[in-house]
């Protein structure tokens, strides 16, 4: 369940046990549909795209509309937020009203998402693994002409066309039969009376509807807490790192358009020169198998280190 408290505005807090279950590969997917007024969307079929989040709608036509992200008290961005493993999140707190976001100034104009990650517990040790597997397929395709149907139609309409002697369904050639989705997370935590430690490793794989399109995200997280001087001093240290490797299609929309409009008499193999034949009679249409071969690899790595010291002077008074 999500809890709400009303002061001068509204605060929605979604705990770990209330987040979406199943094949969830990002914090945005875990949050989707859990808080009223928060809109989460993602481009379908593209595994490399990151979900967008709108907490207070579109507040700017020229500036950014992403909410301010705060992870364990440290300012972050949507890239780092989407890199977090869902299993490493303890809770998400969403601040929507201007009265609640005013403390963050203009940075909180589009709303604020406060992320609290999982930590080790005093006097408690555990080892856990969580994994999900899923598949995705193209639900429905256009019914394309075969090569013989294409020839007959072109002749009956008196159209000029190139006959390359093949019979290719280019949609079938560029699409995967089955795309895999995987999410793996393993964590270890240990605690004594005065200290705690938690370490985790995560891996996410998302394969798209198109061949040669996928995203792999590797994460590592380490958090430690130490109490000193009869617990009057609390020291916290956290390290989070991620690396995202993406194979991005050069132009997904052009590829689908070309696959549906390309001359099916063209073969699905290269010519003697090792090149893909192009239909010179086609307008704004390219051989989709040639487009599929264009490499567009993207790698993004980030590291976040944060620390905190809390002094408990007397009961109820901390600095």
Give the location of each predicted region.
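Short, small/polar-rich motifs associated with maturation and membrane association
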Residues: 1-222, 227-240, 304
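Proline-rich low-complexity regions
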Residues: 51, 67-68, 261-265, 313
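Generic low-complexity segments that are intrinsically disordered, proline-rich and/or Lys/Arg-biased
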Residues: 87, 265-268, 289
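A surface-exposed, glycine/aromatic-enriched loop/edge motif typical of exported proteins
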Residues: 142, 147-156, 241-280
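Extracellular/periplasm-exposed beta-strand and loop segments of Gram-negative cell-envelope proteins
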Residues: 142-144, 171-177, 250, 281-299
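Alpha-helical support elements that line or immediately flank enzyme active sites
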Residues: 305-311
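Short, intrinsically disordered, charge-balanced linker/junction segments flanking boundaries
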Residues: 314-319
């Amino acid at each position: 369940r999500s809890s709400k408290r009303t002061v001068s505005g509204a605060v929605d807090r979604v705990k770990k046990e209330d987040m979406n279950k199943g094949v969830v590969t990002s914090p945005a997917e875990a949050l989707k549909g859990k808080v009223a007024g928060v809109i989460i969307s993602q481009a379908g079929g593209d595994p490399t795209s990151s979900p967008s989040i709108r907490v207070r709608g579109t507040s700017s036509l020229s500036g950014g509309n992403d909410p301010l992200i705060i992870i364990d008290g440290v300012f972050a961005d949507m890239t780092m937020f989407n890199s977090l493993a869902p299993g490493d999140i303890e809770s998400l707190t969403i601040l929507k009203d201007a009265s609640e976001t005013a403390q963050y100034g203009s940075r909180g104009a589009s709303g604020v998402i406060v992320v609290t990650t999982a930590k080790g517990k005093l006097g408690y040790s555990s080892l856990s693994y969580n994994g999900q597997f899923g598949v995705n397929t193209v639900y429905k395709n256009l019914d394309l002409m075969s090569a013989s149907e294409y020839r007959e139609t072109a002749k009956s309409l008196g159209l000029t066309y190139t006959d390359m002697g093949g019979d290719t369904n280019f949609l079938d050639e560029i699409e995967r039969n089955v795309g895999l989705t995987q999410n793996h997370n393993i964590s270890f935590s240990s605690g004594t009376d005065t200290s705690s430690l938690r370490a985790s490793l995560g891996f996410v794989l998302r394969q798209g509807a198109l061949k040669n399109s996928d995203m792999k995200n590797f994460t590592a997280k380490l958090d430690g807490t130490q109490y000193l001087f009869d617990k009057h001093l609390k020291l916290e240290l956290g390290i989070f790192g991620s690396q995202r490797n993406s194979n991005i299609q050069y132009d997904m929309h052009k590829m689908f358009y070309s696959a549906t409009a390309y001359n099916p008499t063209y073969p699905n193999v290269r010519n003697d020169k090792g090149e893909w034949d192009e239909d010179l009679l086609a307008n704004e249409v390219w051989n989709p198998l040639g487009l599929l071969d264009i490499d567009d690899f993207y790698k993004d790595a980030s590291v976040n280190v944060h620390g905190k010291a809390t002094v408990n002077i007397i009961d109820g008074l901390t600095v």
